Amino acid sequence: IISVPRKGMWVHRISSEEANDIFDLRLMMDTFYLDRIVDNIRKNPTLQTQIQANIQSHIRAINIATSQSELASAYQLDEKFHGLYISASQNKKVMEMYRTLNSHAYAAYIVGHETRAQIMDGALEHQKLYDAILSNEKMEVHRLVTLHLENARHNICTILKELELTT
């Protein structure tokens, strides 16, 4: 939301270019702090429980959703997973930057455009990523986090480009 004194407020429409830039930053953060993130998740049973519960809730929410609005609520669980992941960096500035990026802001634009299968693929990628973290397979974690963000980038930027053409 953009607020300008004496002019009002409006919702800033995210462009495919802006989303692409955000994914560049996400990839940078998620991979630069990867060793620390993996180590901290592996030694924190509370965080492990939170992540596993999040993944299970996410998959369940996708499976039982009967409307687009219920599918849209799954994005909150997606965002929560990534917040838990980046919080394991234990770097306050990185966590602040992640929140400021508002990288899940695109959700409002893509509701109804992404299929249940695409949404489920993302949740299942979270599970694979988490399994690799628990196994301490850092090269695999790097590959999976990169793949996950690139898949999301492709899906979201494709949808945003289509929406840009129709407006």
Describe these PLM feature segments:
Residues 1-39, 43, 158-167:
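Short linear motifs at protein or domain termini
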Residues 12, 35, 95, 114, ...:
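Nucleotide phosphate-binding site architecture
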Residues 17, 22, 26, 45-110, ...:
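Conserved amphipathic alpha-helical segments that form helical-bundle/coiled-coil interaction surfaces
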Residues 36, 84, 88, 155:
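Short alpha-helical functional segments enriched in proximate histidine and acidic residues
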Residues 37, 89, 112-113, 160:
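Helix-loop junctions at the membrane-solvent interface of multi-pass transporters
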Residues 119-120:
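Short helix-capping and inter-helix turn/linker motifs at the boundaries of alpha-helical repeat units
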Residues 136:
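Residue-level signal for the nucleotide or nucleotide-sugar donor/cofactor binding architecture
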Residues 139-167:
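C-terminal effector-binding regulatory domain of bacterial HTH transcription factors
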